[in-house]
Amino acid sequence: MKTLPLILLPAAALAAFLVIYFRRASGRIRGQVRLYESLAARFELAASTPKNAAGFDTWPELGGVYRNREVMVRGGSEFDPRLGEYDRLFRVLSGASGPRLREVRQGDFTYVVVKCANPSRLAFYVAFDKSGPKGGTEFDRHFRVKFGDGGEILGGMVITEALRRELLNTVTARWLHPFERLTLLGDALLYIETGRLKTAEQAERFARMIDSMCDAADVVDATPRPLRGVASHVTAPD
């Protein structure tokens, strides 16, 4: 009989811990859902909260059409298999010694996808690089940009001043910052941040980023097909 309390006490403690954990997790998800719903209302997108195999709510997601473009806001942990084809295209663009689509290999991340036709198959990526040149603009000192073959011709128009400002806003005095990648690959512009969407400030930044990415996609789609011969060799997903 003396051993019964020794068994019940740890079990009760574990049960209490699990209750607290799931309540807090549920509260965090509800907070995220509210932020996603605010973005959904702003851009007339559909908000959803998929469930995992165990029946628990996972990441909230947004999807729909905005400015005649398919737009998605999603999240993942470590990697999202839905990005697999874009990861392959990114490896072609960056090369064997270049960065990967996700520089931070572990932890949560949130990303925006804005679809585009990209008739000339332009491709580029923007990556944080604090070892940039001493001269030049502030953007040049903090970020490294690489274009596919011939992409530099229109790069200045695609990576608009609004996009540059938003990326600079993610840079702080701290080494840790949310920005991971901005890239054009095949049929989509992708913006990736480390972590989950947790604050109204983040939601506002994502809202500005969606509009800026749509502006950039308009430029990409206005690029005529005759430039295909000097554009990136990176191809769109089937």
Task: Place the predicted regions along the sequence by residue.
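Feature marks short, highly hydrophobic, charge-poor N-terminal signal-anchor/signal peptide-like helices
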Residues: 1-10
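Transmembrane-cytosolic junction motif
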Residues: 16-39
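Charged, low-complexity intrinsically disordered regions
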Residues: 33-82, 86, 93-238
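Canonical hydrophobic alpha-helical transmembrane segment
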Residues: 12-14
